[in-house]
A protein has these predicted regions:
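Sec-dependent signal peptide recognition
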Residues: 1-8
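N-terminal presequence-like segments and the immediate start of the first folded domain
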Residues: 9-99, 103-108, 113-116, 122-175
Length: 175
C-alpha cells in the first residue's frame, strides 16, 4: 500500500500561544517513543521541521502505511437511546460526542489511540470562551504526546439548533 499523507492546515482556535518556527539548518531529533510506536502500528503522526509548530496540541501530518482505515461519521451528543445529552451544556455535549466516537472506534476493533484525524464543527452560538473545553475533554481520550491531526470550524449552526458540536473522525486500526 502506498503511503497516504494528510497535510492539515492548522486552525489555532483552541489556544492562544504563538507558533514557533524552526531554524532552517536545525538537526533532526530522533523520533520519540510515541512516534516510533505509532509508526510500528502503521501510522506516523508528526510535525515537519519545515512547518510552524502547532499551537493547539495536534499533529500536522498523519502518514498511513498499513492498516484498516475507519471513517466515523459526525457524532453529536445523542446517547444510545437517541436522547440529547446536555441541552444548553457545551461541556456535557462535548463529553457525549467523545463517548460516541470512542464507541464507534471500539465497534470497529480499535481504541481511541487509533484515531488519526478529528474534524470539529462548532455552532457559532457557543461562547468563544467555551472552546477550550473541547481540548480539555479531547485530551482525556487521545494520546497527547502524539495527538491526531485536527481541523476546527465554526459554523452558523448544525442541523438542529440544540446541537452545539459535531465531530467526525478517521482511525487506522492495525490489521
Amino acid at each position: 500500500m502506498n503511503p497516504v499523507l494528510l497535510l492539515i492546515l492548522p486552525l489555532a482556535l483552541l489556544t492562544s500561544s504563538t507558533p514557533q518556527n524552526n531554524a532552517p539548518n536545525q538537526k533532526k531529533e530522533a523520533p520519540s517513543m510515541q512516534e516510533r510506536t505509532a509508526r510500528q502500528s502503521s501510522v506516523r503522526l508528526f510535525n515537519p521541521d519545515t512547518m510552524a509548530k502547532p499551537t493547539a496540541g495536534y499533529s500536522q501530518v498523519a502518514e498511513v502505511t498499513d492498516g484498516k482505515v475507519v471513517y466515523i461519521a459526525g457524532q453529536i451528543a445523542l446517547d444510545a437511546a437517541g436522547n440529547l445529552v446536555g441541552k444548553d451544556d457545551f461541556r456535557a455535549q462535548v463529553k457525549q460526542v467523545f463517548e460516541n466516537l470512542k464507541a464507534a472506534v471500539e465497534a470497529a476493533g480499535g481504541n481511541f489511540h487509533d484515531v488519526i484525524k478529528l474534524n470539529y464543527f462548532c455552532a457559532e452560538s457557543v461562547d468563544p470562551s467555551q472552546i477550550p473545553v473541547v481540548r480539555e475533554v479531547r485530551d482525556s481520550y487521545v494520546n497527547t504526546a502524539n495527538p491526531p491531526t485536527s481541523t476546527f470550524v465554526i459554523v452558523k449552526r448544525l442541523v438542529r439548533p440544540e446541537w452545539l458540536i459535531e465531530v467526525e473522525a478517521v482511525a487506522v486500526i492495525k490489521k
